[in-house]
Structures are given as C-alpha cells and as structure tokens.
Amino acid sequence: MTLEDKIENLLRPTIETMGFQFWGCEYLPAGKHSTLRIYIDKDEVGVTVDDCGKVSRQVSAIMDVEDPISNAYMLEVSSPGMDRPLFHPEQYKAYEGQEVQVRTSSPVMGRKRFKGVMSQVSESDIAVEVDGELYEIPFSLIDKANVVPQF
C-alpha cells in the first residue's frame, strides 16, 4: 500500500462526511519543502476557497494525530480544477473520449509521455490515441494523468 493509499483511507471518511468527494491526493517529497496535496470535489456546484479551508482544518487535525508522514510538509487542499488529475479507474472512465495527458514510469511502445484522446478504459489499462496511433497504457505504469481542458 502506497503512502497516498494510506492517506486516502485515513481521510476519505471525514471528507465525505463533510459533504465532499475525496478526488485524490499526492505527496511530493522535497525535504523540508515537501507537499501533501489533497483534491476535493463537490457535485455540480464545485469547491470554494472556504470549502478548502474547512477541509484543510479537519485534515490537518487528523494528520497531526495519526502522523502518517514523519517529516515536515505543507498541506494543500484544492479542487481538481479543469485539468483535473486522474487517480482511480472510475475517474478515467468518466473522462473516456476526452483528451488526456499521461506520463508513465516505464516506456510504453517507446515513449513515456502521451497527449491524445483516451478512447477506451478497461479494468487494467487505458487506450490513448496519439497522432493516429493507439497506445494501451496499463494503470500500473501511469505516474500521472490529467484531463486536458477544452476551451
């Protein structure tokens, strides 16, 4: 279980009880400048700055007691935004047919960065069409994936 998984299991119940959706989290280690970023969402109405503040106070209290991260870090609570990161298969499924940007930990067919239409989502992977070529990318290799906003 990754640190992010542990943090999600720890925080999801509280965040959902507050009326928000736990969208995901990421821990960015950088010594004393490390960051724990928690993404929350709210159906249809979106997330306000006040919402982020309320959740931040609750999350901070839980993290202080449970202490899953031993070193110093900055806590950020944010909405996923228009270029929302994708963390879970059901999130990928919700954005099937849209343009995404994906970075993998290992090369897939010779590349690690992809920007194209996510044409298919299965239980184990996604298919992204880049310049007319289809790449099947296993979830296990995805380091980061974001929806590309359309204006």
From Swiss-Prot:
Protein localization: Cytoplasm
Keywords: Cytoplasm, Ribosome biogenesis
Pfam family, one: DUF150_C
Major subcellular location class: cytoplasm
One GO cellular component term noted in the UniProt record for this chain: cytosol
Superkingdom of the organism of origin: Bacteria
The keyword RNA-binding is annotated on this UniProt entry: no
Spans traversing the lipid bilayer: none
Stated family: Belongs to the RimP family.
Function: Required for maturation of 30S ribosomal subunits.
Name the record gives this protein: Ribosome maturation factor RimP
Organism whose genome encodes this protein: Hydrogenovibrio crunogenus (strain DSM 25203 / XCL-2)
